[in-house]
Amino acid sequence: MRQVNRKRPYARILPLLVIISVIVAATVTGCGTSTGSAAPASAAPAKQLVFYSAQGYDSAMAKAFQAKTGIQVKLVDDSTGKIVAKIDAERSNPHWDVAWFDGDSTMQGLDNEGMLLQNWTPKDVSNLTALGQSLVPADKAYYPASVTAAAAIGVNTKLLSPDQYPKDWRDLLTPVFKNSLAMNDPSISGPTYPYVAGIMDIMGTAQGKQYFQDLKANGLRVFPTNDNTLKALLAGQVKAVTIQDSALAAAEVKGDPIKIIYPSSGVFTLPGVIAINKNAPDMAAAKQFVEYVLSPAGQKVMADVKNGGGDSYFNPVINGIQPNPARQQSGINWVKVDPIKAAKDENSLKKWFHDNIVQ
Amino acid sequence: MITSSNKAEHTKAEHIGSRLRHWGSGAGDVPGAILLVVLIAYPLATLLGQALLPHLFSKPMSLLPSLAPLRSVFGSKLNLEALVNSLSIGLAEAVLAIALGSFSALALARVPRKVGVVLDAFIWVVFFVPSYVIAQGWVILMQDKGILAQLTGLPNGWSAWFFTRFGLVLIMGLRYFPYVHFGMQEALLHINQDLVQAGRAAGAGRRQIMTKIILPLLTPAWLAGGSIAFAEGFGDFGIAAAITPQAHIPMATYQIYASLSEAPVNYPAAAGMSMVVVLVTAAAIVLQFWWLKKRNYNTLSSAASRDPAGGSNRRSMAVGVAALLFVALFLPLGATLCASLWKTWSGGMSAGNWTLSHYFRALRLGGDGWQALGRSLEYSLVTAFLTMSMALVVGFQMSFKDSRLSRLLNILTMSVIAVPGIVLAASFIFAWNAVWLIPIHLVLYGTPVCLAMAYIASSLPYAIRLEVGAMSQLPANILKAAESFGARNRTVIRKIVLPLVRGTAISTFFMTFTGVMFELPASSLLYPPGQPTFSVLIQSKFDNFDWSGGAALTVIGLVVVFAAYGLGRCLVYYSARVRAEKAQQADRDMVPAAGG
């Protein structure tokens, strides 16, 4: 009996066939693409650009750039958190050329790890506005292409009368907002950390922490991300939220009853920053792309709501660019959050927030 | 998330396996082992390894070991609390899933066949619908000023009880009961009627037969389904984030996500926490094996059974399952459907707020959208086929080879279910983008192959469990009989094993097919630049606060999936009928021959 069973051709051949076919397919495809993005160690013959981005208008920008230059743009569009996770996981063998997302302290984190091309100056850099200039780091590792507010106050106009609208951050401590204010968890939501860091900046660390604790005592709700927070506002679960202004703008233009308020003591700059990989496989194309984004033609692509949705409601940082008229431009008191300090304090401040406010 | 069912009756398999220990010998389980190593063990090792070698992927690479990541995991009180929360929620939810799944399986065995087919198909739908649709649907329905409040004028705060861990357990139980249902359903067909008859003859009542004979005999089935439900709940992030956003129950996966959003991304900490998740799940599985080993469940009979029940009882059973489906499926799916038809989110259910424009917009996807849909269909078909084949091979080996290697791999593949998808996806970057692969041109990261491998890795554990379950139904006697008539293994597999597990193989195919269509973590971290999948496209709608657009795309994707599933079912039904006709024809041919 065993003699028969020792010969088991079928049982052995079938799995082997499967494995062989997988390995063959893998090798063929692996080799086939290794001249492209898969193995940056080898020089790419065809002109291309691998572009990681979390911006709403990235796809339109990629197409416009490709049409203008003939350089093929391969886009990976995702949330900032996933883009950064991907870049960090690739760090020993990076595939990307250009990265673009909101949040200079996050980008500063990548710079601190030595991943970004430093001391490169795009042409036309003198076109940056004063606000724009102030957002360029000393080592020139990344450039601002737009500015939004890390947090503004969004109120549901169906639930509050205009005289109840808050004017500044501290107005949110009044009984009007008892159990009716929400924000995001900075440990999970990317743009929320600059907001928390910004409050510490303008109020001082001790008072800033006290402010969040007072909000908590007034019934502040902390949701994981913009998604939950904005839905809570629209459904009427809360009367006001403090989240990134472009997210509020996105809902406002769709016809939802939202009014965006920029607190008088200041809102915190959340620049959309663009950077080049220090070991970019396609360095020349990468530089050309960043220059295109900062040019008037590129800015026009960004400001078109058809391309970027809510992300198109930004404040320009390039001189002579017409901002989207639907967005408030004047009367905003911008407070610049120092990205180097913010990046340094990030983990300890997030932990404090989690232990004292979220919990 | 890959949804799937489980029909594993592992111990039965092991029992037969141990009897057949000498049935095969030598290196028979090596091919399966290689598959699992390449697809699961190696990627996971590159990630979990960072818990001990935190600089494994730094530049320059360093193999300097460090206990710091593990110390930080075990030293933190919050992590401990998170683990306890995840465990208790996973357990509670698994118990609920077992109760619901047992009820639905037992009930469907009693209702009239036609009603049963319809209800069964809807349970498959519960299975297919992506978790985020269910979770989001419940939120839209239950929140203050949500759909229910709008329809009935309930005051704010009416649903506070729901957005707690009780609501979470409830939703997860409703989400994962099909695992138990499908496991039990198969096992129920093969209950040894002799034992039931014996019980009746000894004067046992209906209730006694159920509690003393049928349910104990089904232990492997509900434990196997329950263990998947546990692993799913233990490793959940999305449902908890949606249902309990403000109650904030720290769970193990929350801690993993928080370390992934640290700056720089703290992979060693995520690895340490994931390692704990894997160990706990593995311990749960080992415990289950140990529990099953103590008893003998080898009570298979080949005769299908159908318990005769009274008419009114049948009707109430059918109504019960329909009610379960109403809560588990129609409420959340209906809420999502409504939301996809709203002009504005804040407008809610008000009369003037309805539009089809999101669907028109979604169908006018443009070239990119259709390409993404086509791409996802291609991935789905290819990975479903490969997963089905591999699960057959590995399942066969696990069922009939009781080697330590296969048992270890079995535990490992199950543990993978509890690892958050994003962690498994990141591990594929580390594994297939590693510097040591550059000289041999095997940097698969960034190619479609890498994404397909990740899809297979995340669906294989479910598929294998399903195959092992189906194969454990094969009476060892048949195989032995075939053997003693001199049949070679090839013949045994082709003529006996394959025909008997055909249905399961087809189930694993559709499970993978639909899972891949909506899979997100691996898709978004691993898709080749410039070639997004359909799920990535949907997610980018949600990321840009176009919820109605995202919901409309999801519904379109679901329609595609249902169409594929319906087509598959028709094919199976048709081929079964053709086979039956052929067999009848053969019988008819035989009779005159014998008579003449």
Predicted segments — roles?
Chain A
Residues 1-48, 359:
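Short, low-complexity disordered leader/linker segments with a strong preference
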Residues 35-50, 63-69, 92, 174-176:
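Immediate post-signal peptide segment of exported/extracytoplasmic ligand-binding proteins
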Residues 50-74, 251:
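Short, polar/charged alpha-helical segment
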Residues 52-57, 78, 82, 95-237:
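Extracytoplasmic ligand-binding site segments that recognize negatively charged/polar headgroups
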Residues 61, 149, 179-184, 211-216, 222, 255-278, 292-318, ...:
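Periplasmic-binding protein-like
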Residues 105-109, 239-257, 306:
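A ligand-binding cleft/hinge motif common to bilobed small-molecule-binding domains
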Residues 152-159, 197, 270-282, 293, ...:
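A bilobed periplasmic-binding-protein/Venus flytrap-type ligand-binding module shared by bacterial periplasmic
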